[in-house]
Amino acid sequence: MLRFAPSPTGDMHTGNLRAAIFNYILAKQRGEKFLVRIEDTDMERNIEGKDKEILSLLNLFGMVWDELVYQSHNFPRHAQMAEYLLSQGRAFYCYCSKEFLDQKREEALAQKLPFRYHDAWAEIEKDSTQKPVIRLRGASEEICFKDEIKGIVSFKPHEVDSFVIVREDGIPTYNFACAIDDMLYDVSFIVRGEDHVSNTPKQMLIQRGVGYEKLLQYAHLPILLNEEGKKMSKRDNASSVKWLLEEGYLPQAIANYLILMGNKTPTEVFALKEAIEWFDITHVAKAPAKFDLDKLRFLNREHFKRLSEQDLAFLLDHKDPSVGGLAKLYLQESSTLNELRPKIDALFAPKIAQGEFASAMILLYPHLRAMIEEFSPALKDFEAFKKEAMERSGLKGKPFFKSLRLLLTGSENGPELSDLFEYARFFFNDIIRLKEPS
């Protein structure tokens, strides 16, 4: 089983979505189940409704989970495992106060030494009124694991000192709950961000402590950088999946980009289902990947081209596929839904006769309306339409073409008129409307 384990403490980060996608792909490739585990153990930071938002996003991106679990539901099992570790002498109660540990950290800092917890401190401040934490004893030997991206990763015993697995309030820490749940659900392969590399030896130590001998596979994804080459943070708009969607980027384009960046792929534009056929986690680069919004814009435009006219019309809140055809004509100048919508809205909005070609618009308008109301046969062919409109209005050349474009689109520039005509003719009664300035 592979798992995606988000915390409901904020908006989904693009790095988290990338990890979800990779886990989903690997589950499909390996014929294993895809588990979504909501890690809701941090009660103070949990935000109501964020779990539903996460699940909704996974659905939107086409990732259907086989199992769903809330980590807090497993608290009884976590407590049981902690008691077992205590009974075996592999864990112990620690009464150190925050103030005591902060002092020890300052002392280590003053000596320019890394802070390490010493087991001998455990009962220095023992008090009958003080609730202890539970710590797992640190490593006694080197801990190594193979990372499918980074290669062999090792930690010396002094790098994994005794650490807290259960807090004073009885709530398990992240590492403890994570390690036990991975064991309970028989997770076989863990793909996550490289900020979790230092958690891996602790989780391995926990599993060894309870007698779990299965060797898990790991792949830690390099961090994402912003366009300035710095680590992407919440201050970067593109770090939020919600922001990308609100800006009008398609889920399939976002997924395409997150798979593509820092990776060797046989093609540049693809769907998630296509990536399942050839994806190889070992081809992901070790180096951090820079988020390039221009590249995402390009991919978004390419995925618009892949959509049927009906599907694109639906995204633009229209039912007629011809609206999707109109929208595709604007892909040379538009890359997102937010850029396409104003173009389509302008087509269907009443036009205002103003500027250099205002008089030509006012002259041409009644003749076009007459052709519409008379169901002129010329409305079926652009050349015939152009010829009849010129004859009726007496306009020709630039005044004719500019005023016609303005009456159709509200803009002096845009796609070829002959291309626009093929789709716009079905909506001439709604499109060719003139509102004189008040």
Curated annotation (Swiss-Prot):
Keywords: Aminoacyl-tRNA synthetase, ATP-binding, Cytoplasm, Ligase, Nucleotide-binding, Protein biosynthesis. Monomer. Its main location: cytoplasm. It catalyses: tRNA(Glu) + L-glutamate + ATP = L-glutamyl-tRNA(Glu) + AMP + diphosphate. GO terms for biological process: glutamyl-tRNA aminoacylation. Belongs to the class-I aminoacyl-tRNA synthetase family. Glutamate--tRNA ligase type 1 subfamily. GO terms for cellular component: cytosol. One of its GO terms (molecular function) is tRNA binding. PANTHER family: GLUTAMATE--TRNA LIGASE, GLUTAMATE--TRNA LIGASE, MITOCHONDRIAL-RELATED. ATP binds at residue 234. NCBIfam families: gltX_bact. This is Glutamate--tRNA ligase 2. Its EC number is 6.1.1.17. SUPFAM superfamilies: An anticodon-binding domain of class I aminoacyl-tRNA synthetases (SSF48163), Nucleotidylyl transferase (SSF52374). It is found in: Cytoplasm. A motif ('KMSKS' region) lies at residues 231-235. InterPro entries: aa-tRNA-synth_I_cd-bd, aa-tRNA-synth_I_codon-bd_sub2, aa_tRNA-synth_I_cd-bd_sf, Glu-tRNA-ligase_bac/mito, Glu/Gln-tRNA-synth, Glu/Gln-tRNA-synth_Ib_cat-dom, GluQ/Sye, Rossmann-like_a/b/a_fold. A motif ('HIGH' region) lies at residues 6-16. The gene is gltX2. Catalyzes the attachment of glutamate to tRNA(Glu) in a two-step reaction: glutamate is first activated by ATP to form Glu-AMP and then transferred to the acceptor end of tRNA(Glu). It comes from Wolinella succinogenes (strain ATCC 29543 / DSM 1740 / CCUG 13145 / JCM 31913 / LMG 7466 / NCTC 11488 / FDC 602W) (Vibrio succinogenes).
